[in-house]
Amino acid sequence: VDRIDLDTQITATFNAADIPNMIGVSDRKELQDLCEKDIRKIIITTIHKFGEAESVLNDRSNIIVMVDEAHRTQEGDLGRRMRTALPNAFLFGLTGTPINKRDRNTFWAFGADEDEQGYLSRYSFQDSIRDNATKPLHFEAVDVKLHIDKDAIDEAYKNITDELSEQDRDDLAKRAAKMAVLIKAPSRVQAICRHVVDHFKEKVEPNGFKAQLVTFDRECCVLYKKALDELMPPEASAIVMHTSGGKGDEYAEWKLSKDDEEKLLDRYRDPNDPLQMLIVTSKLLTGFDAPILQTMYLDKPMKDHNLLQAICRTNRVYAGKTHGLIVDYLG
């Protein structure tokens, strides 16, 4: 896996299934020792623990490597080191959002030669809905008065991902600043938060579900939290975002330790806890599992696999849930 939270999540899943002969790796040295000593176990690790592997650790040809979230961290240095360490291993990539681009290509990293499209096996959204593993997604458009210039956002987003000259980067910074001003306009923030609260109280809370509000950036997280606190009890919402918490960090008050964040998320998963809404910008948009989450209020330009992974936070099976709902404020 490529993140600590996924490591914890998968380890818990294996433990719940009572899988024998399993071991979690605590650091890079332990991983290297296990590989070099040819330990025959199911080893769960993050790919980052291959970061110091400079040469072959084990050249056996009956090693199986299963990579979760295989569309990430595979084409760069970490993926190369893992393949160097285990040169003859069979690699299986698991992902809901394979990427096929020049610089990031899941099919190059894992693709099956036996299939024209590079897949070994596919399990679609329709398959998961049929099996009641997930719920369908519904989308709700918001009144156009809350929208901003979507074409400008799309163009700016496209430029961000392209190779830019220094002059182009300067021009983009100016356009992005204008976009941020539009998104953070006090009247717009107030209008969206009013809509969020009204919608939540009418369509989400009565059914026993909870929500997530995805904002443009960390400043927006704070702006929306302050606006929401005027419309609903402060304990009903919480910010979860990346922050160093160091001296001079303007978002230090929102920093949570790993334990505190886990406690907060456990409270969120509890239907009897007053915490009803998480305000985020980049955290909890992948890998976060909370079946009680039914509605995502989306006020951030997103696309491709990032968008797909984010909106799927809402489609987990939960008592009484018929669908996940995405309320889009950018159109």
Q: Can you say where each PLM-predicted feature lies in the sequence?
A:
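Conserved helix-turn-beta segment of the N-terminal RecA-like "Helicase ATP-binding" lobe
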Residues: I4-R28, A227-P234
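Inter-Walker segment of RecA-like/P-loop motor cores
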Residues: F14-V56
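Conserved RecA-like ASCE ATPase "motif II neighborhood" in helicase/translocase motors
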Residues: R40-R81, D259-L265, V280-S282
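Conserved helicase ATPase motor motifs in RecA-like P-loop NTPase domains
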Residues: H71-T73, A85-R102, N132
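Interdomain helical connector at the RecA1-RecA2 junction of SF1/SF2 helicase-like NTPases
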Residues: R104-G208, K225-K226, E230
